[in-house]
């Protein structure tokens, strides 16, 4: 069950399994899952996964590493087969994004997510965003262009500027409440709301409630008396390290010159 318009999709979080299958996307093939008490996903070897625990606690089990015990507000990424196991009697819920490594831009870039665990998320973001909002980069792109996982913080009484994104934004409300404002209708948001903000391809428009044409994916977030914290997965980025520019090579100095500018000694 879902509530959808031309900008935004809200999913029912009471059922486990695949929520959104976009594995035919030419550039960024992904799948989106809701995992309840460890049920709802069968990971595939060779794919990458990003997850966020939004209720209860789980054991992240793999055959190659020690088990990790994660609780609400924690997150992870990895590129191997895994299991999410309940280790208490309480209900556990996890959203998982699967990146199809062998297709689209991911195949060209030979992408593979690193094994990382973090959290809990903080009360606010570390970076300034727009209209009083802040954000933090929870899992950074391994290299420029790769996916990333973000925390977006909305203080109370935020009325965001309408905007679009060039790729899907896959998210969940970690805590608090607010509203997604779109020309095609508004959608309430509360803790545990799973959603997708649709990408805008620069050419697709739809007729809105006022009878005018607006870009698909146009939206803004609004809060009143409550703060709201959102976890958002981006399938791509225009930020991150490259083979020519990264902290290790930038700050390696040869006769007063950064090794980043010395092509003759850079690893080929």
For each predicted feature, which ranges?
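Intrinsic disorder/low-complexity detector
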Residues: 1-149, 155-156, 185-191, 207-268
């Amino acid at each position: 069950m879902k509530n959808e318009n031309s900008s935004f999709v809200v999913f029912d979080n009471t059922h486990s399994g695949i929520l959104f299958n976009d594995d035919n996307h030419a550039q960024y093939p992904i799948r989106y899952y809701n995992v309840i008490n460890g049920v709802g996903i069968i990971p595939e070897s060779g794919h990458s996964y990003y997850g966020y625990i939004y209720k209860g606690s789980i054991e992240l089990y793999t055959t190659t590493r020690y088990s990790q015990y994660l609780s609400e507000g924690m997150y992870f990424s990895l590129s191997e087969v895994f299991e999410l196991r309940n280790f208490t009697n309480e209900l556990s819920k996890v959203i998982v994004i699967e990146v199809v490594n062998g297709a689209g831009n991911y195949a060209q870039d030979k992408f593979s997510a690193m094994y990382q665990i973090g959290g809990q998320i903080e009360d606010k973001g570390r970076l300034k965003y727009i209209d009083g909002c802040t954000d933090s980069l929870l899992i950074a792109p391994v290299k420029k262009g790769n996916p990333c996982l973000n925390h977006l913080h909305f203080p109370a009484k935020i009325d965001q500027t309408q905007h679009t994104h060039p790729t899907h934004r896959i998210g969940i409300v970690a805590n608090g409440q607010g509203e997604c404002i779109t020309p095609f209708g508004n959608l309430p948001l509360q803790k545990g709301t799973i959603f997708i903000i649709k990408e805008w391809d620069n050419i697709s428009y739809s007729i809105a409630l006022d009878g005018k044409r607006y870009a698909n994916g146009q939206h803004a977030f609004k809060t009143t008396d409550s703060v709201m914290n959102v976890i958002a997965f981006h399938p791509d980025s225009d930020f991150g390290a490259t083979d020519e520019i990264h902290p290790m090579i930038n700050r390696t100095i040869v006769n007063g010159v950064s090794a980043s500018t010395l092509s003759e000694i850079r690893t080929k």
